[in-house]
Amino acid sequence: MADQSLLHSPINPHFFQPILTESRTHLNIPVAFFSKHVEGRNNQNKTVTLRSDASDKTWLVKMDGLKLTDGWEDFAFAHDLRTGDIVVFRLEGEMVFHVTALGPSCCEIQYHTSSHNINDDDRNDQINIASRNSSRVKKNPRKKVESSLDHSRFVAKVSAWCLSNDRLYIPLSFARLNGLNKINSKKIYLQNEEGRSWKLVLRHDKSGMQTFVQSGWRRFCSENGIRQGQYTFKLVRKSAPPVIRLCRAKAKPKQRSVAEYSSDHSCFEGSVTPSSLRNDLLYLPRSFVNSNRLDKRCSEIVLKNEQGVKWPLVLKRFKSVTYLPKGWTSFCQVNRIKAGDSFKFKLVGTWKKPVLSLCPTQSNNHKTPLECSEGNKSEESEEDCLEVKKKKYWSRCRASVENMDDDQTNIGNSSRKKRVSKNPREKVESSSDHSSFVGSVNPSSLYKDQLYLPRNFVSSNFLDKRCSEIVLKNERGEKRTLVLKHFKKDLTFLKKGWTSFCQVNRIKAGDSFKFKLVGTWNKPVLSLCPTETNYHKTPLACSEGNKSEESEEEGTEDKNTSQDCLEVKKRKYWSTCRASAENIDDDQTNIGNSSKEKRVKKNPVKKAESSSDHSSFVANVTASSLNYDRLYLPLSFVSSNGLDKMNGKEIVLLNEEGLSWKFNLKYNQAGKHTYVRPGWSRFCDANGMSQGQQFTFKLVQKHGPPVMYLSLSEHRPKSESSSHRSYFVGSVTASSIKKDKLYLWKSFVSSNGLDKGCKKIILKNKWGREWKLVLKHYKSNCFTIIKRGWTSFCQGNGLKAGDSFKFKLVGTGEKPVLSLCPAESSHEKIPLECPEGIDDVNSLSSNPSSGDDSSRSEESEEENMEDKNISQDCLETKKRKYCSSSSYSQNRFVTLTLTRSAFQTYKLVSFFNNYASRLS
């Protein structure tokens, strides 16, 4: 207790307070100390300054009467104050306090920082509060703190945030011990293991007590193959300019650098980084470029895979850096090279257009590139195939293949190994008689709705001169007419119908096919032959399809008449059904308010929120939130924490590493919803949050500005769709109710085949009532939504914004059925509608005469089609149905049959009047 005399010195007034559980957000000042030394001063309700021996930083804390409020939580967090500790405040000036922290045993807490503590350096790397990483050690002269004497090394954590913001944070302890915190806006050099140097800028932020390097960190990581993880750096020169060298950790396997090359100089090795795929760039090693003189004479270069397919790329130079832009990503996608895979290129041609040949490695020797339907053995056909690949993959492959690659890998993995021929050049080859050809379906052809035909097949059958249409026929004889297009006398392809043909015949990406030419007149016919992948498949049945195809065979002029008629009938029928159902829902909502209140009172514990803790909520990353760059907050969370009264104020989001993002808090009074913006999309990208995932946010500070903490590990709900693809779990958002839309997960849609020809979907609650909604697919943005009825479904089942739900797919086909399962927030809710519903009313009848009355009512409906003013009678009928007293016996049931004419004319009144008069 060397400082005991200072603590009890009568010269400086002081007081002490124990740290309790509620001391996390504020600390009380003793009344005697406040009245003697603080009360009566001009700044008693202003800010006090806190200092400590742990660091040179000062903290500004607001004094609100007898409490230290805003800023105290940061001070306690930085000094690792725990329940049971004691803090001593010594007044040293005008509202300036020196704070000393004591442990539960009244021993002073000693703070120290270890330069080799990986966790400490990780936090120092990105957390603004430096002393939070300090360890607490009791002051005991017999037990000294063991720490390493080598302060020339530090471990840096490379995160996605560091790469996107082009900066590397240096631990504060390392910067202080080596004097880097006193250097600002000076040059610093980073060296890789081979001694190559990169010039960066060293900066020091005094306000946040941070030291970091920038302006070149992203390029250093890209050229040295540094991905997300932990890397060791060593300071090899302290004098200006400082030099820091990259050292690979012994415990981690040696990472292969992009600049690594063999002693031969004709080849070089590297690894694919996420940034190279994202930026579509491949940097070439300087020694490889110089030794082969690629830096002077070349403007183009050709990449060739193991099968001989070539990709011409542009060779760019910027100062001393040589790289390949615009084409590297498509090359990796076609050859199935992913981030983290290693590669090796060999220079096989040194003329004006050099050729880099991809050599087999351990990571790609078992991979087969995406097949090309125009492939051939000759060099000329390879060039044609190259042109096709450029048009098929370069234009939209970057946007489509990333979303489709996972599905393609899962769908066609097992079958693709069997389909690949022994000679990889023979991907799509015409048969010897030129009347048939074999190919495979790739994602680009489905996405662009095009199928390229082999050149020799087209020329041998004279399809390039006289035809503008072609007919595809499946194994059942059903036909579909497509447009035949010719491009520059070299390319021939089918469009406007290829995707729908594959959907109907259940041909997916990765499946192989074989077509045979069976007709060579003005409209040739290609017949689909059975293969290993589709001989067991049955085409989707279409009730109107057979009629339309027969009409095609009978007369080509009326080929689409029945299909168009069917679509018109469907559109007319569903529009009337939706209008009537929405009107009935509104009436039932107004009528059944009192009865609903009685039902809800039976279980008053169940609120809209499943948890009583209003300091946290679960956020869904949806497509709309990413597109509109905003995050909607649940209404209960906002109202309970007073965030609806902070319109236009600033709010801070913290991730698990302590990095902060500032947003604006907006409250829409008309829609009564609160959201944060802008920057939500950037926040999701930096923290690896993707569409369809759920994350927990906790409000850790209510006082301005509010602070919400993101927990990535605490709440990642195990979506039952991942383990069982027939389930879909989500929560109701304010935007989904307002826009009458529900976004479905891509994995749920693709795994259950909902994107294959489905235009309608049925939602069913646990009482059996059904809602018919529209299922809409957006191929350009790769998402699927349910619309025109989602809001009425939520209203009918008592679902509000913030409630969670769970659907199970119980029926497939043209009209799949999603059944609502009981969830935590909705299993006690009773829908506004009775189990008999309005879409399907099937009840047991105890009175046989009711069936006769029903038939009479239907006959009267057919006879009186022009009566329109029955809304009041229908409303009175529903009032009897929902507000009826218990005097009606339970055995009085009736069977109702809802016909299309009933929906169109709103007529059930005749039967209801007869039934009501019979009851009276």
From Swiss-Prot:
Localisation: Nucleus
PROSITE patterns: B3
Highest taxon, organism lineage: Eukaryota
UniProtKB keywords: DNA-binding, Nucleus, Repeat, Transcription, Transcription regulation
Predominant place of localization: nucleus
Pfam families named among the record's database cross-references: B3
Stretch forming the signal peptide: none
GO molecular function: DNA binding
InterPro entries per the UniProt record, alphabetical: B3_DNA-bd, DNA-bd_pseudobarrel_sf, REM_fam
Basic and acidic residues bias locations: 423-432
Regions recorded as binding DNA: 12-105, 153-250, 267-361, 436-531, 616-714, 727-823
Start and end residues of each stretch annotated as Disordered: 405-438, 540-562, 585-614, 842-870
Compositional bias ranges of the Low complexity kind: 842-852
Annotated GO CC locations: chloroplast; nucleus
The protein's name: B3 domain-containing protein REM17
Organism whose genome encodes this protein: Arabidopsis thaliana
